[in-house]
Amino acid sequence: MDEVMEVMEKKYDDSEFGVQELADALGLNRSVLSKKLAAETGLPTAQFIRNYRLDIAKRMIIDNVANRNITEIAYRVGFNDPKYFTRCFTKQYGVSPSSFKDTQEEES
């Protein structure tokens, strides 16, 4: 799992980075990677990658990284469609990224 996290830290911001690229970086085929990752995390590989990106985005919002707007954050964490990012973030955290950002700003 350490190797997976090392690769994720280096590649999460690349919008072209996905399941196949993770498998290639680890020297595994997709099937083996999927089985190993599911055993460790309980998640399909694509969802693991997406959740990793969403966690980084959430931290960026909390840390108010360079006053970035939501679209900039979406691109920064490897999403190439800000609307899809918003849908994923809302599904994951139960609140839109904009609302989450507003809440963080109010608490500051």
Regions found by a protein language model. Name each.
Residues 20-28, 33, 37, 71-80, ...:
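Append "Primarily bacterial transcriptional regulators
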Residues 1-14, 24, 102-108:
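Inter-domain helical "communication" segments and dimerization helices
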Residues 5-17, 37, 41, 59-68, ...:
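Basic, amphipathic alpha-helical hairpins
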